[in-house]
Amino acid sequence: MELETVLQSFQSVRQLLQYTSKNTSGFWRYLFGSTLSKVVNRVKEDYREEFENILADCPGLLASLDLCYHLVFQEKVVRSLDFSSVGRTVASIAFLATILDKWSEKSHLSWDYMLDYMSMQLWRAWLKRRVCIYSLARPLTMPPLPTLQEEKEEERNPAVVEK
């Protein structure tokens, strides 16, 4: 799936957030953007009011980001990103793109720093969730390995295959 391959690489995550931000024109996005960037941008536009209401519930988030105090962002936003389905993953990306747009409006920090920071947080959250899913899918204990005595016994008395 295109979404999973995009989220596997930091560069592609950065490019996705760049193409979904307001700094990229619609014409540029139309010509050079991927289908995923167009979908995420559409979701960002459709749910703009809901995303702004969520941001209004976290006063001081953008100010703390502007002061490079990222603990509030980590606790409030990154922990709540949901990658359980394709739709929720796209909504999470659109929400981060909305935060990036709002942050860049009033910040003194460079655009590249803000883009890199948001891309890194999205990429790390995705990788962390994938590792957690894979670790839950693995068995908790390894099967017991045969002891040296059992191996010697098998060598002396090989199992007879019956026909």
Swiss-Prot record:
Annotated GO biological process: symbiont-mediated suppression of host apoptosis
Pfam families named in the record: Adeno_E1B_19K (PF01691)
GO cellular component, one term: host cell nuclear lamina
Domain of life per record: Viruses
Keyword terms: Apoptosis, Early protein, Host cell membrane, Host membrane, Host nucleus, Host-virus interaction, Inhibition of host apoptosis by viral BCL2-like protein, Membrane, Modulation of host cell apoptosis by virus
Tagged with keyword Membrane: yes
InterPro entries: Adenovir_t-Ag_E1B_19kDa (IPR002924), Bcl2-like (IPR002475)
Similarity comment text for this entry: Belongs to the adenoviridae E1B 19 kDa protein family.
Protein name in the entry: E1B protein, small T-antigen
